[in-house]
Structures are given as C-alpha cells and as structure tokens.
UniProtKB/Swiss-Prot annotation:
Gene name linked to the record: nhaA
Name of this chain's protein: Na(+)/H(+) antiporter NhaA
Main localization of the protein described in the UniProt heading: membrane
Family: Belongs to the NhaA Na(+)/H(+) (TC 2.A.33) antiporter family.
PANTHER family documented for this protein: NA(+)_H(+) ANTIPORTER NHAA, SODIUM ION/PROTON ANTIPORTER NHAA-RELATED
One example of a Gene Ontology biological process annotation: regulation of pH
Annotated transmembrane regions: 14-34, 59-79, 95-115, 124-144, 154-174, 177-197, 213-233, 261-281, 290-310, 328-348, 363-383
Lineage: Bacteria, Pseudomonadati, Pseudomonadota, Gammaproteobacteria, Alteromonadales
Membrane topology reported for the UniProt record: Multi-pass membrane protein
Localization per Swiss-Prot or TrEMBL: Cell inner membrane
Keyword DNA damage: no
Source organism: Shewanella putrefaciens (strain CN-32 / ATCC BAA-453)
C-alpha cells in the first residue's frame, strides 16, 4: 500500500504543477491580444459523421464531454478499487472520510446558496464549491514529502474519492435535461452488455472499449451528461481475474499519466481562461464568485471538520492512527481546492446561461482554490514534524 500511494502521489505532484502552468497560460491567452485566437480555437467546430450518426460540437465541448469522460473512467476505477479492497472497503475505514465528505459538500453548497438566494439563474451553481480536485489536493500534499503520515494521505485520498462519487451523483441527478428515450434505450442495452461481459468473467479490455464507446455516444445523445458513461464502464470492468491479476488496476495505471499530463491540463487550459478586462471589484464581490470562493475557503474546512467532529464524538467514526485534529484541520482546508472539478460543474451549471456567469464561476473557483491551496499547504507544513515520519 505504501508503494502504491508513493507512486500515485509522485505523479499527482508533477501533474499538479502542469495544471498550474495550463491555468496561467490560459489566463495569459485570454487577457492578451491573442484572446481572439484562444476563443476561436476553443470554438472550432468539430464534426464526426458515421452513417446516420452525426456529432457536431465546438472543440470546447469535445474536451468537456469526451476527454473528461476518460477522466471519470479513471475516477470510477479508483472508486471501485477503494470500495472493494482499499480505504473504503469496511465500515470502520470508510466512516470518517464519508462523514467528512458529506459535510464538505453540504456546507459549501449552503454558503453559495446563501449568497445567491432568490436568483434562479445563479442558484444553478450551488454544487460548484462542493467539489474537490483530487489531483491538485494530493499534489499539494505531496510537496511535503515523507513528513506527511500515510494515514493522513489515505484520509485525504478516501475523502476526495467519496467527494468525487458525490459529484457523479449530483451530475446525474441535477445536470441532465431534455432526455431522449431512444438514446437511453440504446445506453441501457450497452450497459446490459457491459454487465454481461463482467458476469461471464471476460477480462480482455477491447470488448469493454467497444461497448463503452457505444454507451458514450448514446449517453451523449440522451441528455444525461456523457462523462457518466466513463463511470459506468469503470464499474463494469472486473477488478480481479481468475489468475489474480487485475484488469481494472492495469487500466487505471495506464490512464493515470494520460489524465495527469494530458486530459486535466488540456481541460484546465480550455476552461480557465477568464478575461479580466471588464471586471471590477464589484464584479469580484458579486454573488457567484464570492459564494464559490467562500464556499471553498471557509465552507469546505468548516464542513469537513464539523461533520468529522460530530461523527467521532457520537462514536460513529474514529480518527486515523497517529493523526490528531491539528493535522485533520489543514487537510480539511486543502479540500477547498475545487479547481478542475469545480470548473467542470460550472460548465454544466451555466451551459445555457449568459457566458458572463461561467466566467464569474471560473474566477471564483480559481481564487478560492488558490487561497485554499496556500492555506492548506502552509498550515499543514506548520503542524507536521520537521523531519520525515516512518511510512
């Protein structure tokens, strides 16, 4: 387990730096004479036609619907592994991160709704500060090296995975519309095929890939967000083969570098470019960005700490071995790094609204995530031992 976590975090650290570079590059492009080129590139029409099938979208939506489906495939594989064999495989292990994740979603959402009360357009963004960017949060923690106890790393990993699971449910329930019965029927047949492959013990990934592609197209056309196809595919791929090997883990390890070094940086570059030219202090303090920023900076740590404390006091959960509240608190602050996940939800929440709302949401996400990262890093650095701990 130690080796797996070390390998995972070493990639997340490098990936987190690349994400930051992508965001800076996007902001520079959006606020320079190259802004027209930037917007034109993302708005480029890309069409795929095979017989009667016709998918016609701007490049930005191919990134958000296509590349991010692969990212959610990876998230689904991680969730399944942790539920069956990892940090969430028993009630005792899963209790504290589960309560923490629930609090870390409810309180930020409540803060956002408090600032956006009475406005049905902006209220659609309530889930934006509820998300945690697992890659960036773990990347920030990885900068502290072996000073961080393994139990604390596992707590953040488990919490972030449950948070991702919550985001998946939110997308399915609240950000799907104009459902197509025919497309849903085709998607259902594809899902039955995937389940059948699993039940028959098929471990070759090619059949899952073929049915998965059919499922993605059907879900894309159905009105349900296409990224959910990635999660469904992940849950159908067997965790263990008869010989003890793991097709699921093999695919997960193969996808990690693609996710960290291509998918997420490309997504960040495509979605983080906010033009600041027409924004004033009043704009920055308007309900959408202030609700998101405060939800991430204050709501996340308050929610995580409050629900964790209640769960421990009621003996529904216990703190990890050799970890105290002084170490949990800065990790709770790190959970406010919403970044790519928050921007992704923002793209769904304000997809049909004035583009201004999307810009405000991304700006609030960037400000909130940046402050949460700084606070979490320096706070955790302060409370950890100066020398490495035994892992």
């Amino acid at each position: 387990m130690e080796k797996a976590i070390r390998n995972f975090l070493s990639q997340e650290s490098a990936g987190g730096i690349l994400l930051l570079v992508a965001v800076v590059f996007a902001m520079l492009m959006a606020n320079s004479p190259l802004s027209g080129l930037y917007q034109g590139f993302l708005g480029t029409d890309v069409q795929v036609r095979v017989g009667a099938l016709d998918i016609h979208k701007p490049l930005l939506l191919w990134i958000n619907d296509g590349l991010m489906a692969l990212f959610f495939l990876l998230i689904g594989l991680e969730v399944k592994r942790e539920l069956l064999e990892g940090a969430l495989s028993s009630v005792a292990q899963a209790s504290l991160p589960s309560f923490a994740a629930i609090g870390g979603m409810l309180v930020p959402a409540g803060i956002y709704l408090l600032f956006n009360y009475g406005d049905p357009v902006t209220q659609a963004g309530w889930a934006i500060p509820a998300a945690t960017d697992i890659a960036f949060a773990l990347g920030i923690m990885a900068l502290l090296g072996n000073r961080v106890p393994v139990a604390l790393k596992v707590f953040l990993l488990a919490l972030a995975i449950i948070d991702d699971l919550g985001v998946i449910v939110i997308i399915a329930l609240f950000y799907s519309s104009d459902l197509s019965t025919i497309s849903l029927a085709i998607a259902s047949v594809a899902i039955l095929g995937l389940v059948g492959l699993n039940r028959k013990g098929i471990t070759a990934l090619t059949p899952y890939g073929i049915l998965g592609l059919i499922l993605w197209v059907a879900v894309l056309k159905s009105g349900v967000h296409a990224t959910l196809a990635g999660v469904i595919i992940a849950f159908c791929i067997p965790l263990r083969a008869k010989d003890g090997s793991s097709p699921s883990e093999h695919l997960e390890h193969s996808l990690h570098p693609w996710s960290n070094f291509l998918i997420l940086p490309v997504f960040a570059f495509a979605n983080a470019g906010v033009a600041l030219g027409n924004m004033s202090l009043d704009t920055l303090l308007s309900p959408v960005p202030i609700g998101i920023a405060l939800g991430l900076i204050l709501g996340k740590p308050i929610g995580v700490m409050l629900f964790s404390f209640i769960a421990v006091k009621l003996k529904l959960a216990r703190l990890p071995d050799n970890v105290g509240w002084m170490q949990i608190a800065p990790v709770a602050a790190m959970c406010g790094i919403g970044f790519t996940m928050s921007m992704f939800i923002a793209s769904l929440a304000f997809e049909q609204a004035d583009p201004m709302y999307g810009d405000l949401a991304r700006l609030g996400t960037l400000i909130g995530s940046f402050i949460a990262a700084l606070v979490g890093y320096f706070w955790l650095s302060k409370v950890l031992p100066k020398k490495g701990v035994l892992l």
